[in-house]
Amino acid sequence: MKWLNSLWIAFSMYSKIRVPMKEWEESSMRYAICFFPLIGAVIGGVFFLTFQIGHLLKLGDILIAALLTSIPILISGGIHMDGYCDTMDAISSYQSKERRLEILKDPHSGAFAIIRSGVYFLLYFGMVSVLTLKSSIIIAIFFVVSRALSGLAVVQFKTAKSNGLVATFQQAAHKRKVTISMVIYLVITVIGMLLVSPILTVVGMLTALLCFIRYKKLAYQLFGGTTGDLAGYFLVRCELMAGLAVVIAEGVIIYGTGHWW
């Protein structure tokens, strides 16, 4: 079944979850991106269960936050964080477009990658350490949202190179069906989040959309289009910024009213 092969390709490429090994046939790759957000659903499910079980067992806020910070990296294998680090090095180099693309391919991590990843994990740890039941559900769902937006970019943005991971998937993908599937994911996730908290949903989605717009502008201006590393950069940045916006908004609401409404 071709759709099942597409599912295995998506999970084998973008996660550490063990799946049956399949040949990367073009017919299967056409729909692989359609299943990319499902990896976010797995991460979000494990994230929320860890939050719930951690508090049930009274593990303490620090240990729970450490576990929640680790889960996206452990399940994804760090592929998106690798792109974030490479992009930070390239952006911070202030070099030409061609030189930035070369830096993205460099397997070594520079000082800016290390510094910015440290700041990222510090902020992420702080963000998950103050989660409540409502915000934990919203942020768990955002693992799907970030991947749906990333999937849209893969088929809709121009690529910086004619080769590479994003170019390979874009050339093979059925753009119309991938776009429709990403929109469906977004609609379902937004409806789900609205049932939890309309205010936090609006705040989180507006932040995610701003990150998406910024991603396109940065990719086109500094690199001439998107790449696999830039896609990873957007994904982890979107999850962090949306998460911070959600917990800050929640804190303002609780502080201002004294209760949830």
Curated annotation (Swiss-Prot):
Pathway: Cofactor biosynthesis; adenosylcobalamin biosynthesis; adenosylcobalamin from cob(II)yrinate a,c-diamide: step 7/7. Its main location: membrane. It is an enzyme of class 2 (transferase). It is a multi-pass membrane protein. It comes from the Bacteria. It is found in: Cell membrane. This is Adenosylcobinamide-GDP ribazoletransferase.
